[in-house]
Amino acid sequence: MSAAPADGTTGAIPAIDWQGQPITRARCAACEHAALRAGGGCEPGHSCMQDAYARRIDRFFRSHRALANDHLDHAYFEVRAIAARHADLFHLPPLMSDPDETVRLQVALRVPQRLLRAMRDDPHREVRIRVAHRIALDDLAAMADDPDYQVRAIAAQRLPVAALPRLLDDGDLQVRLQAARRVEMPALWRLQDDPAPEVRRIAAQRLPAAGLCRLAHDPDWTVRWEVAGRADAPLLTGLLHDVEPEVREQAARRLRLAAAGLEAQHG
């Protein structure tokens, strides 16, 4: 006959520990935190740091933050990760080199900037992504060369505008798009040469209206459509003969609006 569960219930997620063993009444009685249960401070299947289910572990440490420091070296990575979320900051540095990235993710969210710098080269991309979101701008520049495109894209979102032109040559489209949305003149002209129409559309949206002549002949019709939405009258006249009906309609609409505006001005 198997041992009875400590809570006597049969929930959708059973109360088992990280090694797959049921959390029985006997296990609860032998637990180092048995006194907490006697006072209603924990409950198997709901709030228990011995459980394999992360949400139950988190409930335990939310109620007993002072105990988090004592479980940062637990054998189960979820316990270490959740304890790191609640532990005192000065206990976290050893976990910067924890073997599990889930733990290091939590550490990257909390350690001060002087320590975060050392995590820029973490072997796991998700950790570096967290670091890139938090790290001081002076230390972020080195992450613009990260092997992962998402880290570089975050750098393109956060770095000072003056540091963005080199990211316009990035091999990943998402990085170039982030840089294209923020870069200023004269680097803005370079967007016209990008191989991706998505970037050239941004050029058509951001370049001065007087500088759209080249893009009016872009091979991608969506770029020409953007041009037709902003160009001055002389360029619009040429776009009335575009091979794509959407571009012609956009150019004709703009010219009608311009003509109506002139009529209103002159009565």
Question: Can you say where each PLM-predicted feature lies in the sequence?
Answer:
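A generic tandem-repeat structural signature
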Residues: 85, 89-161, 165-169
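Structural detector for tandem alpha-solenoid helical repeats, activating at a conserved register
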Residues: 78, 90-91, 102, 106, ...
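Alpha-helix capping and inter-helical loop/turn segments
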Residues: 57-66, 85-91, 110-115, 134-139, ...
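N-terminal alpha-helical scaffold/docking segments in eukaryotic complex subunits
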Residues: 1-93, 97-101, 221, 225-267
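Aromatic-anchored, glycine/proline-accented short structural segments
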Residues: 155-193
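Short coil turns that connect the paired helices of HEAT/ARM alpha-solenoid repeats
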Residues: 70-78, 97-102, 121-126, 145-150, ...
